Amino acid sequence: MSTFDERENAFEAKYAHDAEMAFKASARRNKAIGQWAAGLLGKTGDAVAAYTMEVITADFEEDGDEDVVRKLVRDLDGKATEAEIRTKMAAVMLEVKDKMVKEG
């Protein structure tokens, strides 16, 4: 195998790893943000888990975060503004990424 092939394989492996980590970070962020929103909605017990799953699956509608933001804005009408939701999502993502780095 040539140096070029080895380099190509290394870049492909890094890309796959980065994509996997981004997916895991988004999933963890969505879980945490779903639990936060469930609390604002007054949900308890199994309803928290069910609502959190709704938030997680909402992220599969399209690429990016807009599908999750739309769901939360609609569900949290009067309880949190779009700006508050986006700020919370960004803060939680930073926490999740920091935790993932520490986990290795």
Question: Can you say where each PLM-predicted feature lies in the sequence?
Answer:
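A charge-rich, low-complexity, intrinsically flexible signal that marks solvent-exposed coils, linkers
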Residues: 1-104
